[in-house]
């Protein structure tokens, strides 16, 4: 498998009730937490779309600890993690909890679909399923846009499932617009995806 593969991500929501959080880069010590959140978030949003064997194959490919560790170590991938303060939306015994994360990738997988000179891809934007609507995704999106601009990229690209209308509206509010129709494979099932881009 090619490192730092593209992934679909579910819709995230408003800033209204954003919990206290710390944004920081990923380290290899975060591998297990990232793999678990990736699986849980993807399944919460999309599990019903797939045959069990296709879903199992995709999760093994994309969210095994080996795959996630490879992406953390890959210089092409840039992760930013949102961790709770201990005791604030935390884990057991008041420990800190991984609330969500975003992953950027350069070079983008989608350069052939755009005339942008140096686009970057937003490959994952995941939050804990029980914290949807708390503004965590918005905070991570704000970080991703600022990071892309700070690195001098002229566009940021992402793919979204054609049937995920809530996510499409979320991205459109940030100024993303469709530039192409593409495919996304989960096991042996191909889904219709929309490629979105925002010029920076």
State where each predicted segment sits.
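Conserved N-terminal entry element of GNAT/NAT acetyltransferase domains
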Residues: 6-32
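Short coil/turn segments at alpha/beta junctions that flank glycine-rich nucleotide-binding fingerprints
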Residues: 134, 151-154
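Alpha-helical elements of the RecA-like P-loop NTPase motor core of helicases
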Residues: 32, 80, 168-169
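Active-site acidic-Proline motif in GNAT/NAT acetyltransferases
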Residues: 128-134, 162-163
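Acetyl-CoA-dependent GNAT
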Residues: 25-28, 36-50, 56-130, 141-143, ...
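C-terminal "cap" of GNAT-fold acetyltransferases
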Residues: 118-120, 154-157, 161-168, 172-200
């Amino acid at each position: 498998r090619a490192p730092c593969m593209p992934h679909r991500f579910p819709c995230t929501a408003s800033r209204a009730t954003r919990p206290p959080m710390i944004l920081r880069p990923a380290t290899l010590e975060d591998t297990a937490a990232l793999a678990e959140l990736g699986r849980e978030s993807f399944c919460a949003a999309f599990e019903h779309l797939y045959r069990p064997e296709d879903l199992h194959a995709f999760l093994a490919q994309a969210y095994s600890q080996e795959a996630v560790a490879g992406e953390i170590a890959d210089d092409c991938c840039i992760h930013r993690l949102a961790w709770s303060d201990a005791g604030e939306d935390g884990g057991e015994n008041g420990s800190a909890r991984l609330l969500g994360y975003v992953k950027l990738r350069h070079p983008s997988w989608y350069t052939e679909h755009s005339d942008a000179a140096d686009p970057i891809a937003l490959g994952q934007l995941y939050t804990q399923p029980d914290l949807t609507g708390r503004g965590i995704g918005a905070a991570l999106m704000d970080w991703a846009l600022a990071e892309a601009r700070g690195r001098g990229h002229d566009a940021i690209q992402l793919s979204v499932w054609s049937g995920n209308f809530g996510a499409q509206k979320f991205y459109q509010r940030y100024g993303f617009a469709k530039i192409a129709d593409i495919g996304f494979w989960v096991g042996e099932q191909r889904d219709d995806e929309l490629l979105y881009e925002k010029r920076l």
